[in-house]
Amino acid sequence: VQSVSNFILLDHLEDVMNPRNLSMTLIFGAALFISLFLLIGKLLSKLSEKNQLFLTAGIAILGVIIQYFLLIHIQAVLRYDHLRVFDGGLEILNTGHLSLTANDGYYGLYPFNISIAVFNSIILRIVKLFRIAEKYYLLSLQCVYLFLIDLGVFFSWKIVRILYSIKHATLFTLLAVTNPMLYVCAMGCYTTTLMLPLLMGTMFLFILFLKEQDFRKKLLWG
């Protein structure tokens, strides 16, 4: 029975992945998704700003819970650059230095990843101070990177709220929570996740700088 059901499923997936069917599926899905968000936008207009803030907080908390639940239970294995910079962090933690010739001269070829390995070693050193078992080092590091992702999303939410409205910011939160990449990227420990809060935080401060009328506060944001 299992073999028959798998065969039927694969046969159905082949039909869906047909270029013509796939295009129609994507168009239909996008139209449905946009229509749904327009409807939600109209419903949000009927809520007060305070209620929209509560709704945003609820959506965000739900998204964070799902992120950490998946991170803890899936326990994804790092590969390629993600694995190299994690191993580099461990090497610095255990030996105090980083070899530029080990692993086929990885850090000699990609010296810009040295800073990521150093950052990882700092986080791992803090984890070690709390006497967390070594088998949880990777998970602990992933939790920190996941926090950085969510911090970047928070700065993005602040930007949308400043430039547009609380309704648009709430829609942005819903869009972020329903974006699969928010959960896929949570497993990685690399440049994209590390730089996200720095990039969005810088943009947030720059927007505050442009909108601020008080010169002394401009200096603070600048």
Please describe what each predicted stretch is.
Residues 87-88, 105-136, 146-147:
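Short hydrophobic/aromatic helix or loop-helix immediately within or flanking a transmembrane segment
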Residues 117, 121, 154-158, 204:
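Transmembrane alpha-helix boundary and packing residues in multipass membrane permease domains
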Residues 181-195:
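Short acidic/glycine- and proline-prone juxtamembrane loop motifs at membrane-interface regions
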Residues 41, 140-163, 201:
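Transmembrane-helix motifs of polytopic, lipid-linked glycan transferases
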Residues 1-68:
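Start-transfer (signal-anchor) and selected internal transmembrane alpha helices
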Residues 63, 172-180:
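Short helix- or helix-capping micro-motifs
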